[in-house]
Regions:
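Short beta-strand-to-loop capping motifs
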Residues: 9, 54-60, 95-98
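Amphipathic, positively biased hydrophobic alpha-helical segments used for protein targeting
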Residues: 17-19, 53, 128
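Flexible, gly/pro- and Lys/Arg-enriched active-site loops
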Residues: 31-33, 41-50, 63-67, 71-161
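N-terminal beta1-alpha1 ligand-phosphate binding loop
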Residues: 1-27, 32-39
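Short histidine/acidic/glycine/proline-rich micro-motifs that form metal-
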Residues: 12, 55, 125-127
Length: 161
């Protein structure tokens, strides 16, 4: 099963926390975006995030993949205090090829992916032909507010950080 994961962190050693996800999926990564510095989304009175997108081929079911991401978040001691608040690690399933779900535990595609520069810009960098709900990710990036696009800063590939 091919899945698109958006990963992010804005607490502690952000690079090392993202690296744990890269390491966990090392043998299953088909493509990876550079790491980007991004402003917080939703709740803006918090530190800047580091974000990246991984495209992975995995054997597990969507729910098993969700649990795998949650285990990584738990290992990073993520505490869910405030919706869209600071976090040590966030592992979101953005899309799964050939799969949709409106289960409140796992919405696929991710219900906010189409409006989040911190998801779309890294995803486009990882896969120039990416599509979300039938529309090209490049088109969705072009439709973002130019100010929002400008706030996303490429830092480099994970192995360079």
């Amino acid at each position: 099963m091919r899945a698109v994961l958006s990963i992010g962190s804005n607490m502690d050693d952000r690079v090392e926390l993202l690296r744990t996800v890269f390491d966990e999926f090392a043998g299953e990564i088909v493509a990876a975006s550079p790491v980007y510095a991004t402003p917080p989304w939703g709740v803006t009175d918090q530190d800047e995030f580091l974000n990246a997108v991984l495209i992975v081929d995995v054997e597990e079911t969507p729910k098993e993949l969700l649990r795998r991401g949650q285990k990584l978040e738990e290992a990073a001691e993520r505490v869910r205090v405030r919706h869209w608040g600071p976090r040590t690690l966030d592992v979101d399933i953005v899309d799964i090829e050939g799969y949709t779900s409106d289960d409140p535990e796992l919405f696929v595609p991710h219900p906010y992916a189409h409006e989040r520069a911190f998801v779309l810009i890294p995803w486009l960098a990882a896969d120039a032909g990416a599509r979300l709900s039938g529309e090209g990710v490049a088109k969705r990036v072009a439709a973002l507010d130019p100010k929002e696009r400008a706030e996303i800063r490429r830092l480099g590939m994970m192995e360079e950080l």
